Design a protein with these regions (language model features):
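Flexible, surface-exposed loop regions and adjacent strand-edge segments
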Residues: 28-29, 50, 63-69, 121-128, ...
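Extracellular loop and loop/strand-boundary signature of outer-membrane beta-barrel proteins
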Residues: 16-18, 76-82, 130-136, 211-216, ...
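Strand-connecting loop/turn motifs
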Residues: 6, 101, 156-160, 235-237, ...
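Outer-membrane beta-barrel "beta-signal"
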Residues: 32, 282-285, 316-330
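Transmembrane beta-strand segments of outer-membrane beta-barrel domains in Gram-negative
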Residues: 1-166
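Extracytoplasmic gating/loop element in the C-terminal half of outer-membrane beta-barrel translocons
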Residues: 160-243, 250-257
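C-terminal beta-signal and adjacent terminal beta-strands/loops
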Residues: 246-263, 286, 294-312, 328-330
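Outer-membrane beta-barrel and related beta-rich outer-membrane complex signature
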Residues: 23-25, 40-46, 57-59, 116-122, ...
Length: 330
C-alpha cells in the first residue's frame, strides 16, 4: 500500500477432530482477522474482529460418563464443563515487536460479553448449572492476556545467550466458572519447562493421579515460563544448546479436583518447577530439527525434600524427559 507496508484481511474456517478412547470431540470455528504492520515493519498488529467456535461432543463412552461425569462421588466441575457443548464468541487484539535480537508479543482477548448483553435483553434460557444458553448451548465468558519477551545476546557469530519470559492469565467470569479446554494453559513439553512431558506439570503442586483425566486436570488459568538458553555452533549444520527452564501453571479459583493448584501470592514462588538440559539442533536455515533432553531440578509436586529436589537425588526414569520438535523453542 501507500505506506510501504501491506495490510491483510484473513477469513478462516477450521474443523478440528479429536478422537480419544473415552470420547470424540469436534470444534468448528470461523474467524475474521485483520493484520497490518508499521512502516518500518518492526511492529505487526493483529485484530481478531470476530471469532466463533462451536465445541460439541458427538460421543462419550458410557463407562467414562458413568465414572466421571454422572457419578455423584466424582462430580468433577472442570471435566463436566468441558464435556458439554459450548459456544465461544471472542474478539481480540495483539501485537508483535521484532527488532531482531529483541521480540515482544502481547495480546488480549475477551469472549461472551456481547452475548451476555443480548442474553439480558432477550432473556436467554438457563441450563441446570445456571448458565445462559444460545440455541440450547451455553456460551463461554472470559478475559485472557498473554505477554512474551525474548532477548538474544550475541557474543560472537556462533555464540548466543537467549533469555525468554512468558506470562499468560485468563479469568472466567459471568457465564463461566471454568475456562474452556481450548483456552486453558498447560506446562511442560518442548516449548516450556522441558524436564516435564507436555501437560505433565502443575497446576501448582498438584500431582497427576489418573491417566484418563490428567490431560484436563493438569491445566490452569495462568502460566509462567522463564528460560535461559546458551546456543553455540558445533560443526556443519549442527548447533548445540545448554538450558535452564523454570515455570508452572496455576488456577485462579480453587477447584477441589486440583488440590494445591490455586495461585497464591505467598506460596507460588515455592511451586516454580525448574529443569536443566542439553539440546542438539540440525539447522537447515529454512527449518530446524531439534532434540532436547532435560532433567528435573526442582519438582513442586513433592513436599518431601528428597523428591522435591531431584537435582540432588536424580532418578533417571522419573526425572528425564526427551523432546523432538521442529523450530526453536523461542
Amino acid at each position: 500500500g501507500r505506506r510501504g507496508s501491506t495490510a491483510s484481511t484473513e477469513l478462516s474456517v477450521a474443523w478440528n477432530l479429536q478422537n480419544r478412547p473415552e470420547f470424540h470431540r469436534r470444534v468448528f470455528s470461523a474467524g475474521l482477522k485483520y493484520r497490518w504492520p508499521t512502516r518500518d515493519g518492526r511492529v505487526q498488529y493483529k485484530l481478531d474482529v470476530l471469532d466463533l467456535s462451536y465445541v460439541y461432543m458427538p460421543w462419550i463412552s458410557a463407562t467414562f460418563k458413568h465414572d466421571y461425569l454422572d457419578s455423584v462421588s466424582n462430580r468433577n466441575a472442570i471435566l463436566r464443563y468441558n464435556y458439554e457443548d459450548l459456544f465461544i464468541m471472542k474478539a481480540g487484539f495483539g501485537l508483535t515487536y521484532n527488532a531482531g535480537d529483541r521480540v515482544i508479543r502481547a495480546s488480549v482477548e475477551t469472549a461472551g460479553n456481547l452475548l451476555s448483553g443480548f442474553s439480558q435483553i432477550f432473556r436467554f434460557k438457563q441450563n441446570s448449572h445456571g448458565q445462559r444458553q444460545l440455541f440450547n448451548i451455553a456460551y463461554a465468558q472470559y478475559a485472557k492476556f498473554d505477554f512474551e519477551y525474548t532477548r538474544l545476546l550475541r557474543f560472537s557469530a556462533h555464540n548466543t545467550l537467549a533469555l525468554h519470559g512468558l506470562l499468560g492469565v485468563a479469568w472466567p467470569y459471568g457465564n463461566s466458572t471454568v475456562l474452556p479446554f481450548e483456552k486453558r494453559y498447560f506446562s511442560g513439553g518442548a516449548n516450556s519447562v522441558r524436564g516435564w512431558s507436555v501437560r505433565e506439570l502443575g497446576p501448582g503442586k498438584y500431582r497427576g493421579r489418573d491417566g484418563r483425566i490428567d490431560f484436563i486436570n493438569q491445566t490452569g488459568d495462568m502460566r509462567l515460563d522463564l528460560n535461559l538458553e546458551y546456543r553455540t555452533h558445533l560443526f556443519w549444520k549442527f548447533d548445540g544448546a545448554a538450558f535452564v527452564d523454570a515455570g508452572n501453571i496455576w488456577t485462579l479459583r480453587s477447584y477441589p479436583e486440583q488440590p494445591g493448584g490455586q495461585f497464591q501470592l505467598d506460596t507460588f514462588f515455592k511451586q516454580i518447577a525448574v529443569s536443566y538440559g542439553l539440546g542438539l539442533r540440525l539447522n537447515f536455515g529454512y527449518f530446524i530439527l531439534r532434540l532436547d533432553g532435560a532433567m528435573k531440578a526442582i519438582n513442586p509436586a513433592y513436599d518431601d525434600h528428597k523428591d522435591h529436589y531431584p537435582i540432588f537425588h536424580p532418578r533417571w526414569g522419573r526425572d528425564f524427559a526427551f523432546h523432538f520438535a521442529v523450530g526453536m523453542p523461542f
